[in-house]
């Protein structure tokens, strides 16, 4: 019995390969994420609709502390931008040289009604390039 890779898996692999050829590193990050990385570090206001229960899967009874020692909740990530923040932090901590060029593919989750064009879990790929002449 043989199997085949899912078309989405093939598409993400090909996109990652193309951007790798252009000098981008493919990065991965947690699907269960603190609201700090998912919202706060990206300047998403506390009252933004994306934070509502009807848009985001919040994890009940799971709390942690952010880097400022403030209590934060946890969510299933709503985008792959959390990987951008984590990678930029790593670059600063490790005093790495810029430019920073990353490809961030991954599953994301939205608490919404499913139909022919909407699903609670889907894939997203985003790129980030940071440099002096970017």
Where would I find each of the regions flagged by the language model?
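TRNA-recognition modules of translation machinery and tRNA-sensing kinases, especially anticodon-binding
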Residues: 1-134
């Amino acid at each position: 019995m043989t199997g085949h890779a899912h078309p989405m898996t093939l598409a993400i692999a090909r996109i990652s390969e193309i951007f790798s050829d252009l000098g981008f590193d493919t990065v991965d990050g947690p699907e269960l994420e603190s609201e700090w990385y998912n919202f706060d570090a990206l300047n998403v206001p506390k009252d933004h609709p994306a934070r509502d229960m009807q848009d985001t899967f919040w994890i009940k009874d799971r709390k942690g502390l952010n880097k400022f020692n403030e209590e934060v909740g946890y969510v299933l990530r709503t985008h792959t931008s959390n990987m951008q923040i984590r990678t930029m932090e790593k670059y600063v901590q490790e005093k790495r040289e810029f430019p920073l060029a990353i490809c961030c593919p991954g599953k994301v989750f939205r608490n919404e009604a499913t139909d022919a064009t909407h699903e609670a879990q889907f894939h997203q790929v985003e790129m980030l390039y940071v440099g002096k002449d970017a």
